[in-house]
Amino acid sequence: MSNANSFTKEDLVACGLGNLFGPNSPRLPKDNMLMIDRVLKINADGGEFGKGEIVAELDINPDLWFFDCHFAADPVMPGCLGLDAMWQLVGFFLGWEGAEGKGRALGVGEVKFTGQVLPEAKKVTYKLTIKRKVYRKLVMGIADATMEVDGREIYSAKDLKVGIFTDTSSF
């Protein structure tokens, strides 16, 4: 497990290259698909269930790539990108705890969208609480999460599942 409890954008980019937790650790996406600018807090025993929590942020500005293509004359951040960021953070948590392999989203029990991220927004905040960790032949994390834009909760997800696989050839 890493001793660090917060991470910069540079750290997250290093994770995408396999240079943060080690070459065999789960990697974050690179470039435009990395939907996180910083991890403010990560721990292994906090959160509602006492199994870990993560708080992370994404800075919003009108020049972000998705505002140009989603939608013409009606720019809005795709909801699937916020959901993907939540999965990214579950995989990041498992790598932070020392899991090795390739991360894959396995599903989500429930998702609700009650707002949107527009170009004039300033900041998205992700808050995840880990519900369950499985470290057997299959490594898996299950979490509940919310996403806020400028302090207002607009997305919630229950039972986000991410698995870590040493071999993805049959996945």
Curated annotation (Swiss-Prot):
Signal peptide (residue range): none
Function according to Swiss-Prot or TrEMBL: Necessary for the introduction of cis unsaturation into fatty acids. Catalyzes the dehydration of (3R)-3-hydroxydecanoyl-ACP to E-(2)-decenoyl-ACP and then its isomerization to Z-(3)-decenoyl-ACP. Can catalyze the dehydratase reaction for beta-hydroxyacyl-ACPs with saturated chain lengths up to 16:0, being most active on intermediate chain length.
Keyword ATP-binding: no
Protein name: 3-hydroxydecanoyl-[acyl-carrier-protein] dehydratase
GO MF annotations, alphabetized: (3R)-hydroxyacyl-[acyl-carrier-protein] dehydratase activity; trans-2-decenoyl-acyl-carrier-protein isomerase activity
Family: Belongs to the thioester dehydratase family. FabA subfamily.
Entry superkingdom: Bacteria
Catalytic activity: a (3R)-hydroxyacyl-[ACP] = a (2E)-enoyl-[ACP] + H2O; (3R)-hydroxydecanoyl-[ACP] = (2E)-decenoyl-[ACP] + H2O; (2E)-decenoyl-[ACP] = (3Z)-decenoyl-[ACP]
InterPro entries named among the record's database cross-references: FabA, FabA_FabZ, HotDog_dom_sf
Active site residues of this protein: H70
UniProt keyword Lipid biosynthesis present: yes
Quaternary structure, from the entry: Homodimer.
Gene3D superfamilies reported for this sequence: Hotdog Thioesterase
Cellular component GO terms, alphabetical: cytoplasm
Originating gene: fabA
EC number: 4.2.1.59, 5.3.3.14
